[in-house]
From Swiss-Prot:
Organism, scientific name: Arabidopsis thaliana
Residues where 1-deoxy-D-xylulose 5-phosphate binds: 204, 230-231, 255, 278, 291, 296-297, 300
Residue stretches in coiled coil: none
Sites where the protein binds Mn(2+): 229, 231, 300
Entry protein name: 1-deoxy-D-xylulose 5-phosphate reductoisomerase, chloroplastic
């Protein structure tokens, strides 16, 4: 973790790191790094009211454990920590299993759930030997059973959504890693919370769509929601030990995605292959496109609001091309705390699985960060014209209720249509905006789980058939 006093990343153009064994020290700043920022005469560190607001007679947000006083140990298992993985064949799931494979003395898998990749799921079962496995696509259940017919131990297999839910609330599991993309991850997460499982949350929609319902439920069951994505994990790490009321601002860093160096005028020429070329991260197609549009960051703003209780005015997005600083917080005394590391999703996943401990990692498979070799870190403000997703996300967040879920679902459908080449890249923003506009008259401020799911489905259907300003509709196969 790094601390920068009285520094706003949007005003700082670069941070440079020098190897003092090769260069002379920088005057006035010992420690081998220099800070350069534009507009030297401009004031910074303006007074911003405390961004942490906790309603009366309610507990702090679930992602605040360890903030002031560490909890007493409550280990209730013997041997390696038992975990369930919902979405085991996706990017989050496979990286979670990589961690388990490298740390068999720390973690063991008791249940796995996947969507449709039966071949990979069968391989995972053979390697990690869970007691329960589920495949969401019920039509593939016989294929899975055939693939595991010669298994040397008794395995329970449950098909469909109910199977995924049973994996999420498996009685042996202590922590459930939720890696399913979209609102499909909401019901399993709710089931895990009701069963008292701590949540390693990699499914943004759980809070973006379900925040008004999920957070009170987590408080009720004394469940910890531990963020497994890099940005919120960074914030979570920075707030450890932070007194209540000390948080002033959250600063989410963004790589800028595939088009950060493209002129706005060229965006009308974007092809699917262009959007899938992320400069820093190796991720799935949907999240890679979200990174290009910056919708991922807009959704993370909403998630940060729910996780950490920050007002939207006190959550800032900063473009940081190197993706070394994963996010920052500013405290009331104008200190800025940052979490740094190579862009590797295994790091935040591991932290959610091991918290409050830190698991030692091999330097071969987990390279250490060398700031002197890195050289410098740069920052810039995002362009609202290039990234209209930011305004859409902040507006949806401030509207609250079901609007955030509608935004997320409409974006998911729009990205799907873009990847299938049914709409253009710029149409993604139009589809989301028109869907949110249509929802304004039906907004539910305090939705039930059923209402959250209903408007998720409605938004997808509306987005799939929305008439664009050009008069065109999405092209269906």
């Amino acid at each position: 973790m790094m601390t920068l006093n009285s520094l706003s990343p949007a005003e700082s153009k670069a941070i440079s790191f020098l190897d003092t064994s090769r260069f002379n020290p920088i005057p006035k700043l010992s420690g081998g790094f220099s800070l350069r920022r534009r507009n030297q005469g401009r004031g910074f560190g303006k007074g911003v009211k405390c961004s942490v607001k906790v309603q009366q007679q309610q507990q702090p947000p679930p992602a605040w454990p360890g903030r002031a006083v560490p909890e007493a140990p409550r280990q209730s298992w013997d041997g390696p920590k038992p975990i369930s993985i919902v979405g085991s064949t996706g990017s989050i799931g496979t990286q979670t299993l990589d961690i388990v494979a490298e740390n068999p003395d720390k973690f063991r898998v008791v249940a796995l759930a996947a969507g449709s990749n039966v071949t990979l799921l069968a391989d995972q079962v053979r390697r990690f030997k869970p007691a329960l496995v589920a495949v969401r696509n019920e039509s593939l259940i016989n294929e899975l059973k055939e693939a595991l017919a010669d298994l040397d131990y008794k395995l329970e297999i449950i098909p469909g959504e109910q199977g995924v839910i049973e994996v999420a609330r498996h009685p042996e599991a202590v922590t459930v890693v939720t890696g399913i993309v979209g609102c499909a991850g909401l019901k399993p997460t709710v089931a895990a919370i009701e069963a008292g499982k701590d949540i390693a949350l990699a499914n943004k929609e759980t809070l973006i769509a379900g925040g008004p319902f999920v957070l009170p439920l987590a408080n009720k069951h004394n469940v910890k929601i531990l963020p497994a994505d890099s940005e919120h994990s960074a914030i979570f790490q920075c707030i450890q030990g932070l007194p209540e009321g000390a948080l002033r601002k959250i600063i989410l860093t963004a790589s800028g995605g595939a088009f950060r160096d493209w002129p706005v005028e060229k965006l009308k020429e974007v092809k699917v292959a262009d959007a899938l070329k992320h400069p820093n991260w190796n991720m799935g197609k949907k999240i890679t496109v979200d990174s290009a549009t910056l919708f991922n960051k807009g959704l993370e703003v909403i998630e940060a609001h729910y996780l950490f209780g920050a007002e939207y005015d006190d959550i800032e997005i900063v473009i940081h091309p190197q993706s070394i600083i994963h996010s920052m917080i500013e405290t009331q005394d104008s200190s800025v705390l940052a979490q740094l590391g190579w862009p590797d999703m295994r790091l935040p996943i591991l932290y959610t699985m091991s918290w409050p401990d830190r698991v030692p990692c091999s330097e071969v498979t987990w390279p250490r960060l060398d700031l002197c070799k890195l050289g410098s870190l740069t920052f810039k403000k995002p362009d609202n014209v290039k990234y209209p997703s930011m305004d859409l996300a902040y507006a949806a967040g401030r509207a609250g209720g079901t609007m955030t879920g509608v935004l997320s679902a409409a974006n998911e459908k729009a990205v799907e249509m873009f990847i299938d080449e049914k709409i253009s890249y710029l149409d993604i923003f139009k589809v989301v905006e028109l869907t949110c506009d249509k929802h304004r008259n039906e907004l539910v401020t305090s939705p039930s789980l059923e209402e959250i799911v209903h408007y998720d489905l409605w938004a997808r259907e509306y987005a799939a058939n929305v008439q664009l300003s050009s008069g065109a509709r999405p092209v269906h196969a």
